[in-house]
């Protein structure tokens, strides 16, 4: 998978900018605040329909503008694809080869991408919501139906929460309505749990192998998906309906939904100890690096091709051994795009070196 050309219009600090890319390693060089990360964000948004930095599309528009437009030419298994994403009048329009997509699920996963930045450390150090978001974003690239499941589940969750907030003191009418919503939570939630569990298993096996190489076999990495307090899939699915019934009174008392995949978590462990609680900063960075590279391998196995890799100033956060490991790894990929403040030590590795300054992009010969 490869990007050939990108056009950003009224996106972030870019008024109207086009960029041509090459296979191999592209380095975007420039001082902080010049727009390097915005290029990666534009590519990521174009491929996933989402930003990894903000939740509101309006924040992506250039200052003083109410719209933005993104275009990109890609090669996927020798096929040429033109992707477009337009935000205008508070509406998002996405197109593949000029044909509008009715749903985001028709679009996501057409071209796969893996993004890695220092902020990804939150995947280990942060809360369960950050880890669920990581899983869901990347499952969606493999299985477009997962987006539909998440949207449907969130709607049911909102409806049940609204019902619980009404109170009604556990009347027969309220209980009957809660039971109806519980049926939907059970049906949709079980599919979400199964998808997350399967993806975590694939990721864990590959991540364990890569982490072993990074740590020279000194530590063993495991990733366990915990659903409904269980670390076994069949046990979790069997307990789901029982927990929904048992916790109904407590949910009515607290006026919020307490049971479902919206409260699940993925646990990273080193030698059976919590990496979040006991891992050093270096170990936690190694876990994130291993997980991201494992994700690349999982996509390659499923799609038959490596995804596009975007690296946002990650080398400065890694020690020399891990930095060299990552750079050597990128040699096997079709294309990697990386941001740096200075690329002096990597000019021989790069197939394309670009200078980014004040929203302008130029080649460095």
From Swiss-Prot:
List, alphabetically, the CDD domains matched.
ABC_RecF
One GO location term (cellular component): cytoplasm
Q: Highest taxon of the source?
A: Bacteria
Q: Which InterPro entries match?
A: DNA-binding_RecF, DNA-binding_RecF_CS, P-loop_NTPase, RecF/RecN/SMC_N, RecF_2
Q: Where in the cell is it found?
A: Cytoplasm
GO biological process assignments: DNA replication; DNA synthesis involved in DNA repair; double-strand break repair; SOS response
**Which Pfam families does the UniProt record give?**
SMC_N
For the ligand (ATP), the binding residues are 30-37
- Statement: the UniProt record of this protein carries the keyword DNA repair: yes
Major localization class: cytoplasm
**Keywords, alphabetical:** ATP-binding, Cytoplasm, DNA damage, DNA repair, DNA replication, DNA-binding, Nucleotide-binding, SOS response
GO MF terms, alphabetically ordered: ATP binding; single-stranded DNA binding
The role this protein plays is: The RecF protein is involved in DNA metabolism; it is required for DNA replication and normal SOS inducibility. RecF binds preferentially to single-stranded, linear DNA. It also seems to bind ATP.
Family per similarity comment = Belongs to the RecF family.
* Record protein name field: DNA replication and repair protein RecF
């Amino acid at each position: 998978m490869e990007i050939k050309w990108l056009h950003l219009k009224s996106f972030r600090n870019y008024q109207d900018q086009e960029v041509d890319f090459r296979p191999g390693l592209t380095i975007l060089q420039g001082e902080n605040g010049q727009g390097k990360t915005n290029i990666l964000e534009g590519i990521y948004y174009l491929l996933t329909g989402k930003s990894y930095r903000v939740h509101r599309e309006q924040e992506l528009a250039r200052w003083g503008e109410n719209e933005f437009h993104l275009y990109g030419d890609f090669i996927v298994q020798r096929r040429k694809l033109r992707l477009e994403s337009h935000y205008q009048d508070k509406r998002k329009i996405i197109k593949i080869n000029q044909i509008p997509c009715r749903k985001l699920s028709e679009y996501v996963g057409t071209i796969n991408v893996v993004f890695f930045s220092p902020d990804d450390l939150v995947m280990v150090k942060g809360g369960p919501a950050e880890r669920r978001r990581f899983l869901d974003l990347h499952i969606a690239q493999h299985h477009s139906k997962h987006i539909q499941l998440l949207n449907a589940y969130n709607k049911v969750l909102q409806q049940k929460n609204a019902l619980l907030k009404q109170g009604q003191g556990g009347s027969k009418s309220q209980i009957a309505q809660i039971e109806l919503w519980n049926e939907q939570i059970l049906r949709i939630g079980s599919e979400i749990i199964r998808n997350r569990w399967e993806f975590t298993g694939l990721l864990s096996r590959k991540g364990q192998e890569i982490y072993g190489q990074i740590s020279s076999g000194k530590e063993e990495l495991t990733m366990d998906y915990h659903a409904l307090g269980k670390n076994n899939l069949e046990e979790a699915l069997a307990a789901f309906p029982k927990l929904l019934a048992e916790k109904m009174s407590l949910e009515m008392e607290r006026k919020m939904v307490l049971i479902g995949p919206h409260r699940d978590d993925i646990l990273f462990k080193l030698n059976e100890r919590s990496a979040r609680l006991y891992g050093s900063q270096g170990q936690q960075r190694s876990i994130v690096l291993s997980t991201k590279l494992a994700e690349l391998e999982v996509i390659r196995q499923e799609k038959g091709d490596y995804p596009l890799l975007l690296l946002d100033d990650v080398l400065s956060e890694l020690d020399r051994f891990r930095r060299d490991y990552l750079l050597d790894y990128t040699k096997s990929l079709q294309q990697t795009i990386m941001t740096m403040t200075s690329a002096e030590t990597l000019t021989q590795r790069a197939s394309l070196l670009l200078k980014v300054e004040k929203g302008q992009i130029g080649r460095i010969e």
